[in-house]
From Swiss-Prot:
Protein name, UniProt field: CLAVATA3/ESR (CLE)-related protein 13
GO terms, molecular function: receptor serine/threonine kinase binding
Organism of origin: Arabidopsis thaliana (Mouse-ear cress)
Compositional bias ranges of the Basic and acidic residues kind: 87-97
One of the protein's GO biological processes: regulation of cell differentiation
Superkingdom field: Eukaryota
Length: 107
């Protein structure tokens, strides 16, 4: 009997506190606080700044062009002509050519 009273009181306090927080959130915007006509300017970080926990300086603008591959040059093999297609007896579909070589997802 005493535990049900305690649970009812705690539930009542929970609902009241929730109601207070919601009412402050909804009606807190209509308070009579003065609006600042001159907001503070946005602070921008320089291009070279120090990140704590790192030994090196982090550069925001970095030129990645030396690392980009030349799009005109291709290291991939040329596609073989589609003359020798075989049917897989297990699945009854055409066998696919599986590329060989290192996995491109691993460096």
């Amino acid at each position: 009997m005493a535990t049900t009273r305690v649970s009812h009181v705690l539930g009542f306090l929970l609902w009241i506190s929730l109601l207070i927080f919601v009412s402050i959130g909804l009606f807190g915007n209509f308070s009579s606080k003065p609006i600042n006509p001159f907001p503070s300017p946005v602070i921008t970080l320089p291009a070279l700044y120090y990140r704590p926990g790192r030994r090196a300086l982090a550069v925001k603008t970095f030129d990645f062009t030396p690392f980009l591959k030349d799009l005109r040059r291709s290291n991939h093999r040329k596609a073989l002509p589609a003359g020798g297609s075989e049917i897989d007896p297990r699945y009854g579909v055409e066998k696919r050519l599986v590329p060989s070589g290192p996995n491109p997802l691993h460096h």
